[in-house]
UniProtKB/Swiss-Prot annotation:
Belongs to the bacterial sortase family. GO terms for biological process: proteolysis. The active site is at H17, C78. InterPro entries: Sortase, Sortase_A, Sortase_dom-sf. It comes from the Bacteria. It comes from Bacillus subtilis (strain 168). Seems not to play a major role if any as a sortase. The lineage of its organism: Bacteria, Bacillati, Bacillota, Bacilli, Bacillales. Keywords: Hydrolase, Protease, Thiol protease. This is Putative sortase YwpE. Coiled coil: none annotated. CDD domains: Sortase_A (cd06165). Disruption phenotype: Mutation does not affect extracellular levels of the sortase substrate YfkN. It holds the Pfam family Sortase.
C-alpha cells in the first residue's frame, strides 16, 4: 500500500476483500480477537504479529496506512460484505520473526 513498506519494519499495511463467503480473504477478520496471531511471510522470513486492536473507521481515514515507529501490521477491509463506507481495521504488534522453512 506504500512503496516504502517492509515486513517486520514500521507499519506494514495490507488491504483485502471482505466477501459474503465468510471464510475467504479478509472476511474472517470480523471475528478476530485481541491476542490472536497473524503470520505473514516473504518466503525468506516469517513474521508473527499479535492482534492489539480492532476498529471500524471511515473509508476516508487513510492515516492507518502511514508509517509509524512501531513494528506493526495493519489489516484493512470493508466492515461488511456489501457496499459500505466503513472499514474494519485490525492492528497487531510484531512479536517474533524467524527464517522461513518449507
Amino acid at each position: 500500500m506504500r512503496r516504502d513498506q517492509k515486513m517486520g519494519e514500521g507499519n506494514y499495511p495490507l488491504a483485502g476483500h471482505h466477501l459474503k463467503q465468510k471464510n475467504l480473504l479478509f472476511g474472517p477478520l470480523e471475528n478476530i480477537k485481541t491476542g490472536a496471531q497473524i503470520v505473514i511471510t516473504d518466503f525468506k522470513k516469517d513474521y508473527i504479529y499479535s492482534v492489539t486492536s480492532k476498529d471500524i473507521i471511515s473509508e476516508m481515514d487513510a492515516d492507518v496506512v502511514e508509517e509509524t515507529n512501531k513494528k506493526e501490521i495493519t489489516l484493512i477491509t470493508c466492515d461488511k460484505a456489501v457496499k459500505t463506507e466503513g472499514r474494519l481495521v485490525v492492528k497487531g504488534e510484531l512479536v517474533d520473526s524467524f527464517g522461513h522453512t518449507n
